[in-house]
């Protein structure tokens, strides 16, 4: 398994890990042949492929790689091609908009995107359905609830502090931490409670700072654009990370203006993220055309980008950060004004 570095990525990896281990045990196959490692981005890179192929070669094993909550994008094509060139079987389980070239390199692909482009059906949920078909008794419905809450899915119900705990642990883990490490931690109630408490404290502190560094722009009578400087409250050594911090900003303003269509744009030196609430989506706002236009107009400035209709991100070249931010703000205002 190769899984993304947040709760949805971890839970989707855990679903496949647990089911594959249970299957191996039943078939009297070596369970230690099932393992997994975190990927600290949405891109499966050539370096990731090299590490996986070498790891399998050194163990004298044929390799199959299951990638969860990442890898179905154009930026991952080189890494996926490296896997295929080595004779590796490739499966991707994801809920992000897929790239045709990436899919062409997969032996199997499981996604919710054709019937849900909002991303509400998380990778954790899709992986759960795959896990049930591998070994039904090992699939864990509780992990699905964690992933739905963490990704702010409209399918989420209930309150699961474990979701915050896994997001916190993933943020501070080593870049390629093993899936076994998470498998142990999700059974450690004390560890999860501690991580949850630390996550909440970090979020409270970050929101307090960001409220002082966010501006609001009225668009028409029913829409607001919130622009927040995420660098004021986030860093590699603090929690929450930028995406989670922007969620806090979005939630805060949605609570203040419950009848408004609200889009939040959070930026730092090298990235910009978008969040849109249900009213904005219902009015027709979609982040993907905004990002597609940026890629077309400023290809030299955009390193990578994509996401869902209501939550997306672009990585930018630092020297072009300001110009990308200004253009994105214009595109969002234009999109909201049309609705």
Task: State where each predicted segment sits.
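Short, solvent-exposed amphipathic alpha-helical segments in soluble enzyme
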Residues: 15-19, 81-85, 245-250, 279-281
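Flexible glycine/proline-rich, aromatic-decorated loop/lid segments
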Residues: 91-92, 96-109, 290-299
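N-terminal small/polar loop signature for handling phosphorylated ligands or for N-terminal nucleophile
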Residues: 5-11, 22-91, 97-103
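Hydrophobic/aromatic beta-strand patches that form the interior of the parallel beta-sheet core
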Residues: 66, 89-93, 108-110, 263-265
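A structured phosphate/pyrophosphate-recognition subdomain
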Residues: 1, 5-6, 102-241, 249-257, ...
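Glycine-rich, acidic loop segments that terminate in or are immediately followed by a histidine
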Residues: 229-339
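Predominant activation on well-ordered alpha-helical scaffold segments within soluble catalytic domains
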Residues: 13-17, 50, 124-132, 243-250, ...
């Amino acid at each position: 398994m190769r899984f993304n570095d947040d709760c949805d990525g971890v839970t989707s990896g855990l679903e496949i890990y647990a089911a594959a281990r249970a299957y191996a045990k039943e078939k009297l196959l070596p369970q230690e042949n099932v393992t997994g490692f975190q990927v600290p981005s949405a891109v499966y890179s050539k370096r990731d492929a090299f590490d996986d192929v070498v790891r399998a070669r050194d163990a004298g094993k044929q390799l199959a790689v299951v990638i969860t909550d990442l890898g179905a994008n154009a930026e991952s094509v080189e890494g996926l091609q490296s896997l295929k060139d080595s004779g590796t079987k490739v499966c991707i389980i994801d809920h992000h908009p897929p790239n045709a070239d990436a899919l062409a390199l997969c032996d199997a692909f499981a996604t919710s995107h054709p019937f849900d482009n909002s991303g509400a059906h998380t990778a954790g949920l899709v992986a759960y359905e795959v896990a049930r078909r591998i070994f039904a008794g090992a699939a864990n419905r509780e992990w699905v609830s964690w992933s739905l809450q963490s990704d702010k899915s409209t399918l989420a119900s209930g309150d699961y502090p474990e979701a915050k705990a896994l997001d916190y642990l993933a943020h501070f883990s080593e870049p390629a931490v093993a899936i076994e490490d998470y498998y142990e931690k999700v059974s450690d109630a004390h560890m999860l409670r501690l991580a949850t408490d630390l996550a909440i404290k970090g979020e409270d502190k970050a929101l307090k700072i960001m409220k002082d560094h966010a501006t609001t722009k009225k668009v028409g009578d029913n829409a607001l654009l919130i622009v927040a400087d995420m660098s004021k409250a986030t860093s590699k050594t603090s929690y929450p990370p930028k995406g989670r911090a922007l969620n806090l900003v979005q939630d805060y303003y949605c609570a203040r203006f419950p009848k408004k269509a609200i889009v939040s744009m959070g930026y730092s030196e090298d990235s910009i993220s978008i969040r849109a609430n249900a009213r904005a989506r219902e009015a027709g706002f979609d982040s993907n055309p905004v990002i597609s236009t940026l890629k077309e107009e400023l290809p030299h400035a955009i390193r990578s980008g994509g996401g869902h209709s209501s939550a997306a991100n672009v990585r930018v070249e630092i020297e072009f950060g300001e110009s990308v931010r200004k253009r994105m703000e214009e595109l969002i205002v234009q999109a909201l004004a049309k609705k």
